[in-house]
UniProtKB/Swiss-Prot annotation:
Native source organism of the sequence: Escherichia coli O6:H1 (strain CFT073 / ATCC 700928 / UPEC)
Pfam families, A to Z: GMC_oxred_C (PF05199), GMC_oxred_N (PF00732)
Entry protein name: Oxygen-dependent choline dehydrogenase
Alphabetized PROSITE patterns for the sequence: GMC_OXRED_1 (PS00623), GMC_OXRED_2 (PS00624)
Pathway(s) per entry: Amine and polyamine biosynthesis; betaine biosynthesis via choline pathway; betaine aldehyde from choline (cytochrome c reductase route): step 1/1
Cellular component GO terms, alphabetical: plasma membrane
Cofactor: FAD
PANTHER family: CHOLINE DEHYDROGENASE, MITOCHONDRIAL, GLUCOSE-METHANOL-CHOLINE GMC OXIDOREDUCTASE
A GO molecular-function annotation: choline dehydrogenase activity
Mode of membrane association: Peripheral membrane protein
Catalytic reaction equation(s): choline + A = betaine aldehyde + AH2; betaine aldehyde + NAD(+) + H2O = glycine betaine + NADH + 2 H(+)
InterPro entries the UniProt entry points to: BetA, FAD/NAD-bd_sf, GMC_OxRdtase, GMC_OxRdtase_N, GMC_OxRtase_C
EC number(s) stated in the UniProt entry for this protein: 1.1.99.1, 1.2.1.8
Keyword Transferase belongs to the record: no
Length: 556
């Protein structure tokens, strides 16, 4: 089998590349996905409110686990990643958050990454998006990904939480992806107008999968990339339960889009990475790149949970006797409780003036429950998800075997810097202040977690060690740049090799201020044009907010 391009991983970026490259009918593409199809009849992935279900099994989730995290009481922590057409866009929380403009401007400060500035990237965010309330300078109107904005009157807790943030002195913003990210406001979501999850399989592959020049193979576990000298010339994979490898040749390029955990793992198995690590497993060295698998970053978050005095939370939706009605309303009408992920309000703030742009993110949820659906509080409640955005802590991904079915060693080194602890203490104390504003007096009952007795630095730190969780945003393990630890250049091409690119969240040099899916899609769109030799979309002229030393909040 021969193709022009072989794409490894049908996730948020891989599906973008498969769709854009096959717009040219003379270009042939093979798309390999280790998981299965995105079954449209499976409510677990298609119903927005069911977002916790895919994380509870292994059909759609790689269900990775970290090594014992040394600063988190040696907990082995969850590291869920999507498996199946859509990748992590098939199982994520559907929050459409692009990050802060200054995140990308910060990337562009690196030599030869100048064209990754916010205004250079904004046209590609817009290209990917169809926003339900229409396009403007910041949002697209005819892209593959459906984005739904929160509408007034969904739940009184959303508006009360935004109002409480304003009463605490923080700004309101009507668009967290628009002119000003900083502040509290409604959150955009990747949900279709018919109340279905808008994964990249739905948005991109649905329009491309019938093209004769696109071949999609599911249940295809990539073993390694095949090299001829320093040039990638093909891929070898295992189909289903077979132990007999299948091969295909790439006439032009191999495009690795397997995500921040699997992309470095595949490179290492293919002979690209740290020479000492590869020698441990007798893997012939193709090219030494010490940065492969290093620079691992993530967002850590915790929940502050409160009793709700008014019966307006989603607690009734957790009762089994209400779920058939909710399911029917969603299935036949695309409406109701099932049609939302219920992360419809949130915000970004600076916890201290030393931060030039927001370093703390909030998601508000009108029910008290863990992200993966466990430990639901058995009463009306609500919670704030809060966490820091740009931790200085760095971890790694390293193979533990040549066997493609064996998970790699993953260590995030969460909370390994003093800055981490200061930010989380600040986050808890600021959140409590917001929760005690008059806007929430009508609804706020007792603090369920961490509980009012948890006050001192030592008590707060212990709460974080025991209860903070991943926000499922790993990135950075094949970072873009030109220093000695960089893996790819500004076009995703792997340093020192030919015919091989990495295109996914692993190439982010530094984690962004917000959820990763929207920016991963943007990366796919931008590099697709580079691969095709197309001129970049014209740079945007839209304005954007920069604090420039403004106080973090208004004085009361």
């Amino acid at each position: 089998m021969q193709f022009d391009y072989i794409i490894i991983g049908a996730g948020s970026a891989g599906n973008v590349l498969a769709t854009r490259l096959t717009e040219d009918p003379n270009t042939t593409v093979l798309l390999l996905e280790a998981g299965g199809p995105d079954y449209r009849f499976d409510f677990r992935t298609q119903m927005p409110a069911a977002l916790a279900f895919p994380l509870q099994g292994k059909r759609y989730n790689w269900a990775y686990e970290t090594e014992p995290e040394p600063f988190m009481n040696n907990r082995r922590m969850e590291c869920g990643r999507g498996k199946g057409l859509g990748g992590s866009s098939l199982i994520n929380g559907m929050c459409y958050i692009r990050g802060n403009a200054l995140d990308l401007d910060n990337w562009a400060q690196e030599p030869s990454l100048e064209n990754w500035s916010y205004l250079d990237c904004l046209p590609y965010y817009r290209k990917a998006e169809t926003r339900d309330v229409g396009e403007n300078d910041y949002h697209g109107g005819d892209g593959p990904v459906s984005v739904t904005t929160s509408k007034p009157g969904v739940n009184p807790l959303f508006e009360a939480m935004i109002e409480a943030g304003m009463q605490a002195g923080y700004p309101r913003t009507d668009d967290l992806n628009g002119y000003q990210q900083e502040g509290f406001g409604p959150m955009d979501r990747t949900v279709t107008p018919h109340g279905r999850r808008a994964s990249t399989a739905r948005g991109y592959l649905d329009q491309a999968k019938s093209r004769p020049n696109l071949t999609i193979r599911t249940h295809a576990m990539t073993d390694h990339i095949i090299f001829d000298g320093k040039r990638a010339v093909g891929v070898e994979w295992l189909e289903g339960d077979s132990t007999i490898p299948t091969r295909a040749a790439a006439n032009k390029e191999v495009l690795l889009c397997a995500g921040a955990i699997a992309s470095p793992q595949i490179l290492q198995r293919s002979g690209v990475g740290n020479a000492e690590l590869l020698a441990e497993f007798d893997i012939p060295l193709v090219h030494e790149l010490p940065g492969v698998g290093e620079n691992l970053q993530d967002h850590l978050e915790m929940y502050l949970q409160y009793e709700c005095k008014e019966p307006v939370s989603l607690y009734p939706a957790l009762q089994w006797w209400n779920q058939p009605r909710i399911g029917a309303e969603w299935l036949f009408g695309g409406t109701g409780v099932g049609a939302s992920n219920h992360f419809e309000a949130g915000g970004f703030i600076r916890s201290r003036e030393e931060f030039a742009w927001p370093n703390i993110q909030y998601h508000f949820l009108p029910v008290a429950i863990n992200y993966n659906g466990s430990n639901a509080v058995k009463e009306h409640g609500f919670q704030c998800h809060v966490g820091s955005m740009r931790s200085p802590s760095r971890g790694h991904v390293r193979i533990k075997s040549r066997d493609p079915h064996q998970h790699p060693g993953i260590l995030f080194n969460y909370m390994s810097h003093e800055q981490d602890w200061q930010e989380f203490r600040d986050a808890i104390r600021i959140t409590r202040e917001i929760m005690h504003q008059p806007a929430l007096d009508q609804y706020r009952g007792r603090e369920i977690s961490p509980g009012v007795e948890c006050q001192t630095d030592e008590q707060l730190d212990e709460f974080v060690r025991n209860h903070a969780e991943t926000a499922f945003h790993p990135c950075g393990t094949c970072k873009m740049g030109y220093d000695e630890m960089a893996v790819v250049d500004g076009e995703g091409r792997v340093h020192g090799l030919e015919g091989l690119r990495v295109v996914d969240a692993s190439i982010m040099p530094q984690i962004i201020t917000g959820n990763l899916n929207a920016t991963t899609i943007m990366i796919g769109e931008k590099i697709a044009d580079m691969i095709r030799g197309k001129e970049a979309l014209p740079r945007s002229t839209a304005g954007y907010f920069v604090a420039n030393g403004m106080p973090v909040r208004a004085k009361k």
